[in-house]
Amino acid sequence: TGAINFVAGMILDYRAFDTFGESNVLFMAVIAVLMLLQRDKKNIDAAEDQEMQEDEMLDAEDSKLILKKGAKCLAPVVILYGIYVVLNGHLSPGGGFSGGSIIGAGLILYSVAFGHKKMQTFFTIKTLTLTTAACLLTYCGCKSYSFFTGANHVGWEVPKGTPGAILSSGFILPLNICVGLVVACTMYGFYALFTKGEV
């Protein structure tokens, strides 16, 4: 496989379609939860409207000053560490699932500290669905080449690069990135839907 991390080679090369299926399950789960829990903005009663306004006022107040200061320092570090874990998944322990979980936790931390409205300025339902769908299509395209080469990888081999380099191990790095983004979007999507009823 060209990957120094044997587990990444196993999961994203030999068992790539199994991992693709797991990523699709995550996507379908977040879409199902979205359909079931998304708040209907046209059909809100007075009590629910008042509750939403109170939540917005609490988010706007400086009652979470310590949390905001801590998250302002910590959230970028957490997200950056998650990106590092995703990008080095073929070289060391980690990869798309663990790095995506770390990135998702960073997004949740930011949302808890600064409020759902501020998070919606750059992460909306459109962002969630487009990112997840694009990652799944990219994953499918990267691994479908074997079907076009006789389903045995004999006709055309993906260049593996130099073992130990960041751009090595063929398609394992892009697949790790795709899986990481799907997991991060799913984690944040579940959090937002269960707490606010919208992404």
Where are these predicted regions, by residue range?
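Membrane-water interface at loop-to-transmembrane-helix junctions
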Residues: 53-74
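Membrane-interface helix caps and helix-loop-helix hairpins in membrane proteins
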Residues: 86-95
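Hydrophobic alpha-helical membrane-insertion segments
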Residues: 128-145
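Alpha-helical transmembrane segments
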Residues: 112-127
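Individual transmembrane alpha-helix segments
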Residues: 2-34, 169
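Juxtamembrane interface elements at the cytosolic ends of transmembrane helices
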Residues: 7, 20, 30-58, 190-199
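Hydrophobic cores of alpha-helical transmembrane segments in multi-pass inner/ER membrane proteins
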Residues: 26-34, 105-111, 175-189
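Structural signature of hydrophobic alpha-helical transmembrane segments
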Residues: 70, 94-105, 176
